[in-house]
């Protein structure tokens, strides 16, 4: 028998907690025998004194096991259960293509995603722009779509990881969100509850990233790779660039359009292509579908070029209640804003830097993101044809197009976009889309 206050005292004194102590505390979070004050106190003790890898693994697996852990054995699937998770960014539409691409190559992708908050967009918000698409299906429908389409992208159900829901809301209110140990456990407990064989982790770096510096992003990537592998799920983390908008757009309906265009081959943003291929190829190699990256990329290019990935996306959309002809006729179903107009630079030159976070916040001010949880969104608004770093701009060459519902909203977003995209005389050097891979062998 343990006492919550003694566990808090140990961590306050920078001692190592046993797996049993951590399991006891997490059980208390779930069944409300540990108070909010005690949870907040442990969170702050961990924030200051940290956890070693064994403690992080114990916290992650205890939180994973606090609710239902999905089991796919009864479905007799003939491929691995694989997934990816991103720390979030602006114009990060990767999940919409990556899930169907991986499924088209023989994987099964039960992707449990989140909504946007702050400057980052949420995958579920993009799907909410599709009429009829059900992001909260019951378990039977979720499993049916995973089996039949190979991929289903839905929201977190109430019976998954209840400990994290309670712990996270308290961390959010007590300034302990930034702890790498607690971030690791929060992300991975949710992902590993999906019953995965393998996971590719996308940790963003730069002005639109969740972590403030490259060093902090790398520390998080190393922690996630070590803990996930320690918990029994093959995992690699990729450090990817978020110093500019990843797709050519940012918003909800506009990102869905770009994702469909990517899969059909109508338009593939080269930066988006590189990061999507890097993550998806890693999923295929970790899952044993491909023996190396070159083979994985060849398979992925094939399912893009022969239309199989787009077909599977369409099957997922219709399976979850969306239109059966969505891929062919998306413009019929996705909303358009009242105003769609270009923004021009004040001077001629090159796009030299981008405050990606500010561009994400511009989408929020347009109504495409949340100021607080529960806000309703306007799915039609956002930014499109956003210039890339190194692009030449001038008074007659737009830096972006703004999709707004009123003149006032347009003017506010226009000022934000002009401020966020820096113009200079010298073309900047190209930065890599993927900075590095952190595999278990690198730890």
From Swiss-Prot:
A single GO cellular-component term from the record reads: cytosol
Biological processes per GO annotation? pyrimidine nucleobase metabolic process; thymidine metabolic process
Among Pfam families, the record links this protein to: Glycos_trans_3N, Glycos_transf_3, PYNP_C
| Highest taxon in the source lineage | Bacteria
Tell me its family. Answer: Belongs to the thymidine/pyrimidine-nucleoside phosphorylase family.
Q: What is this protein called?
A: Thymidine phosphorylase
Record EC number:
2.4.2.4
> What is this protein's function per UniProt?
The enzymes which catalyze the reversible phosphorolysis of pyrimidine nucleosides are involved in the degradation of these compounds and in their utilization as carbon and energy sources, or in the rescue of pyrimidine bases for nucleotide synthesis.
Q: Which SMART domains does this one have?
A: PYNP_C
In alphabetical order, the GO MF annotations are:
1,4-alpha-oligoglucan phosphorylase activity; thymidine phosphorylase activity
Q: In which pathway does it act?
A: Pyrimidine metabolism; dTMP biosynthesis via salvage pathway; dTMP from thymine: step 1/2
Q: For this protein, what reaction is catalysed? A: thymidine + phosphate = 2-deoxy-alpha-D-ribose 1-phosphate + thymine
- Keyword tags: Glycosyltransferase, Transferase
Q: Which InterPro entries match?
A: Glycosyl_Trfase_fam3, Glycosyl_Trfase_fam3_N_dom, Glycosyl_Trfase_fam3_N_dom_sf, Nuc_phospho_transferase, PYNP-like_C_sf, PYNP_C, Pyrmidine_PPas_bac/euk, Pyrmidine_PPase_CS
Oligomer status and interactors:
Homodimer.
């Amino acid at each position: 028998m343990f006492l919550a206050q003694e566990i808090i005292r140990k961590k306050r004194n920078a001692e190592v907690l046993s797996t049993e102590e951590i399991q006891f505390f997490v059980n208390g979070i779930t069944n409300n025998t540990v108070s909010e004050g005690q949870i907040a106190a442990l969170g702050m003790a961990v924030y200051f004194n940290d956890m070693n890898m064994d403690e992080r693994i114990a916290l992650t697996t205890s939180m994973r096991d606090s609710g239902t852990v999905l089991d796919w054995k009864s479905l007799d699937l003939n491929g691995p259960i694989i997934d990816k998770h991103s720390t979030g960014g602006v114009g990060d539409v990767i999940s919409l293509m990556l899930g169907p691409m991986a499924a088209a190559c023989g994987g099964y992708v039960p992707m449990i995603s989140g909504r946007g908050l702050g400057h980052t967009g949420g995958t579920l918000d993009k799907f909410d722009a599709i009429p009829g698409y059900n992001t909260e299906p019951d378990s039977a429908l979720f499993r049916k779509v995973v089996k039949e389409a190979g991929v289903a992208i839905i929201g977190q159900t109430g019976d998954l990881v209840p400990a994290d829901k309670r712990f996270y809301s308290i961390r959010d209110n007590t300034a302990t969100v930034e702890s790498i140990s607690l971030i690791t456990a929060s992300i991975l407990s949710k992902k590993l509850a999906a019953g995965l064989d393998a996971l590719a982790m996308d940790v963003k770096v730069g002005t639109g990233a969740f972590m403030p510096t490259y060093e902090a992003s790398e520390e998080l990537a190393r922690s996630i790779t070590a803990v996930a592998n320690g918990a029994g799920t093959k995992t690699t983390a990729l450090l990817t660039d978020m110093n500019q908008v990843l797709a050519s757009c940012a918003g909800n309906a506009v990102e869905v359009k770009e994702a469909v265009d990517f899969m059909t081959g109508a338009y593939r943003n080269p930066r988006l292509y590189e990061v999507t291929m890097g993550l998806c190829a890693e999923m295929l190699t970790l899952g044993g579908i491909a023996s190396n990256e070159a083979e994985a990329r060849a398979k992925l290019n094939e399912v893009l070029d022969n239309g199989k990935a787009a077909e599977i996306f369409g099957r997922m959309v219709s399976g979850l209640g969306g239109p059966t002809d969505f891929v062919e006729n998306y413009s019929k179903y996705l909303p358009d804003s009242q105003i769609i107009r270009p923004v021009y630079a004040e001077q001629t030159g090159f796009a030299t830097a981008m405050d990606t976070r500010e561009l994400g916040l511009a989408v929020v001010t347009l109504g495409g993101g949340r100021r607080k949880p529960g806000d309703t969104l306007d799915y039609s608004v956002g930014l499109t044809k956003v210039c890339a770093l190194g692009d030449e701009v001038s008074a007659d060459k737009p830096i972006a197009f703004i999709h707004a519902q009123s003149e006032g909203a347009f003017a506010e977003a226009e000022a934000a976009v002009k401020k966020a995209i820096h113009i200079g005389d010298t073309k900047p050097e190209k930065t890599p889309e993927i900075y590095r891979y952190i595999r278990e062998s690198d730890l």
